[in-house]
Amino acid sequence: VHLEFDKLQVLQSAFITAQTGRVTGVLGRNGCGKSCLFKCIMGGIKPQNIFIRFNDETETDYGHIGKRIRYLPQNVFIPADMTLGEAFRLYGVDYDGLVAFDNKFHTYQRLRSSQLSGGEVRIAEMYMVLNSEAEFCILDEPFSNVAPKHVEMMQNLINEHKATKGIIISDHMYESVMGITDDLFLLRDGYTFPIKSREDLIHHGYILR
């Protein structure tokens, strides 16, 4: 992906891969372009150049891409005036599964997303994305506003679903990301760098030690 705004280089030959059975992590500082990268993939931002391939076949139709990849953006995507039950029906995901995942949601089905905490909405949205029929999922800041107990539950859910999906995840809780990723990239200065160890993150200046 190559993306620039008014000659400001945001992404320069940024490159990531994902495959079924593996979790790919993308780390980077605030403003480095992680969300821009994901939006380019999903068609939310039109870059100067992008190349998307599924199993060696190039894909340019964003309608098809949207069916094959489901995206959890940084911001809430369930409308504030929509109930959780309605959102799950529209997304084609069984609400009872969410209740089985976390029983506190058994009384939330008729509540609007605006009536829930940020962490509760995040859990519900991530559950929807992971349980969709898409082949791949992109999770942008899934652990935002989520309590540590539920972060662990969400990590387990990601590991469960990677058996049938390719999952890309980015979050500032880098240790939580590193704990579940099979492949890891760092986005810096518009480029992606493969990360093999914690020492690589230190080398690139992402962490101090």
Description of each model-found segment:
Residues 173-179:
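Conserved H-loop
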Residues 46, 57-70, 205:
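ABC ATPase NBD coupling module
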Residues 27-29:
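The feature captures the beta-strand-to-loop junction immediately N-terminal to the Walker
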Residues 191-209:
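Conserved beta-strand-loop-alpha-helix hinge in the C-terminal portion
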Residues 141-142:
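Walker B catalytic motif
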Residues 71, 75, 80-95:
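Q-loop/switch helix immediately C-terminal to the Walker
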Residues 11-13:
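Conserved structural motif at the start of ABC-family nucleotide-binding domains
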Residues 42:
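Helix-to-loop junction immediately C-terminal to a conserved catalytic motif
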